[in-house]
């Protein structure tokens, strides 16, 4: 079994992938698979042909297309697996764009990769960033900045972006009740696209 808290995917200076992991039984062979489809490893029981099989706890995988997001499946020789992706995405205009996938809830379920992201403001994305974010398939952007911040630096994801935008300003000191109020309907969420 993989220790998900010790499984990581990062890009190096050449934008190739450095993957590291820890298993509860070290020394076993691990096969690594790659896809550009975030749902591929969730849908298919057969991940295909491995890029690499190793007894090590790290691997360097060539990034064959730097404009596309890649997802990885690590499979132990016992058949146990872990789906991984980069936590911090390489965007020029916002250095803190992160995928929240891979985190485990108290109930034991794991959030899928490529479904929920968090970031700072999206108003300073480069054209290259716009193309990269478009391929992520975002459907909803929730802006938690204060209204003045949203007005001064509006979120823009490109002319042909296909997402809904929701303004959900969080005032300083109001974080404690924000989610509770959202669930109770005190804070309204409207489609403003």
Residue ranges and their predicted role:
Residues 1-193:
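Cys-dependent protein tyrosine phosphatase-like superfamily
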């Amino acid at each position: 079994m993989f220790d998900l808290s010790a499984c990581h995917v990062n890009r190096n200076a050449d934008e190739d992938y450095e993957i590291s992991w820890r298993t509860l039984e070290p020394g076993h062979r691990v096969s690594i698979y790659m896809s550009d489809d975030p749902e591929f490893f969730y849908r298919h029981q057969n991940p295909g042909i491995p890029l690499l099989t190793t007894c090590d706890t790290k691997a360097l995988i060539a990034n064959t297309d730097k404009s596309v997001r890649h997802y990885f499946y690590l499979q132990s020789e016992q058949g146990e697996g872990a789906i991984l992706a980069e936590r911090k995405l390489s965007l020029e205009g916002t250095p803190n764009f992160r995928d929240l996938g891979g985190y485990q809830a108290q109930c034991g379920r794991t959030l899928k990769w490529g479904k929920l992201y968090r970031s700072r403001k999206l108003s300073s994305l480069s054209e290259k960033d716009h193309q990269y974010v478009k391929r992520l398939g975002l459907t909803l952007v929730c802006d938690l900045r204060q209204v003045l911040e949203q007005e001064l630096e509006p979120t823009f994801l490109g002319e042909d972006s296909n997402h809904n935008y929701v303004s959900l300003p969080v005032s300083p000191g109001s974080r404690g009740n924000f989610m509770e109020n959202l669930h109770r309907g005190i804070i309204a969420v409207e489609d403003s696209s």
